[in-house]
Amino acid sequence: MRRAAPAERREYGNAGEEAAVRFLEAQGWRVRDRNWTCRFGELDVVAERDDLVCFVEVRMRSTATWGDPSHSVSFAKQRRVVKAALRYLFAHDLRGRMFRFDVISVVGRGERATVDHIPGAFDAGM
């Protein structure tokens, strides 16, 4: 099996994030940021609805042959997302707001892609 070139993987990842954003917006979420980075890592999507800020990790695979993409969010990745999210809340003066960590899995591409949203997929461990 051929491994995709970095540019091809990035393009594929962008398509997955686009599908996730379309899904969230259809559910009434407002996307605040995409691919926000700090020294702790990257936040794929930051969205809000009402008083809730949602930090979304997006995972994508071309097929489900190797399982659901959401299963690839390791504990170490969760910790990096939590640290980046706390930094985001501080940097954007959102302290005191309710927040949650979701995972969106995208399998396939284009119109045939399936999107699965897992609200509260992990927590901050506080």
Curated annotation (Swiss-Prot):
GO molecular function term, any single one: nucleic acid binding
InterPro entries assigned: Restrct_endonuc-II-like (IPR011335), tRNA_endonuc-like_dom_sf (IPR011856), UPF0102_YraN-like (IPR003509)
Gene3D superfamilies xrefs: 3.40.1350.10
Highest taxon above the source species: Bacteria
A Pfam match: UPF0102
Entry similarity comment: Belongs to the UPF0102 family.
Protein name, per record: UPF0102 protein MXAN_3551
Phylogenetic lineage: Bacteria, Pseudomonadati, Myxococcota, Myxococcia, Myxococcales
